[in-house]
């Protein structure tokens, strides 16, 4: 597979994997409100795996388009560029908070988990409002 097809495939896969990550995150949040810990645990595993795949694809995506990010210094950050940069920052916050959750928080209903959930909701809302 040549480089352009690989980039296209990676970019294309980001959409369904993001939807899966978001859906499993919402289900995880809902399961955390209940008393069935097994259900929460299953959703936590599913969400972690979907989000790990999303993170890997995101890293490949950013690496593939690194020249665009570097070009922001000279071209400036206006219009759609500003929206894409802010979206990148929001996704980075979601990834960092998710990694912190996996590494340092045990169980449901943590304050960091709630912030991670809010960041995810904001990411979906912002994506929906700014990108075509």
Feature-to-residue mapping (PLM):
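Membrane-embedded alpha-helical bundles that constitute the cytochrome b-like, heme-associated redox core
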Residues: 1-129
């Amino acid at each position: 597979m040549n480089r352009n097809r690989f980039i296209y495939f990676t970019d294309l896969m980001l959409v369904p994997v993001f939807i899966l990550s978001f859906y499993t995150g919402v289900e995880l949040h809902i399961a955390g409100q209940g008393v069935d810990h097994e259900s929460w645990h299953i959703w936590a595993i599913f969400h972690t795996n979907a989000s790990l795949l999303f993170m890997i694809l995101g890293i490949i995506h950013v690496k593939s388009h690194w020249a665009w990010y570097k070009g922001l210094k000279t071209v400036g950050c206006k219009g759609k560029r500003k929206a894409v940069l802010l979206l990148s920052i929001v996704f980075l916050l979601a990834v960092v908070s998710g990694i912190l959750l996996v590494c340092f928080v045990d169980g449901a209903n943590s304050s960091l988990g709630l912030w991670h959930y809010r960041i995810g909701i904001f990411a979906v809302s912002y994506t929906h409002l700014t990108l075509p």
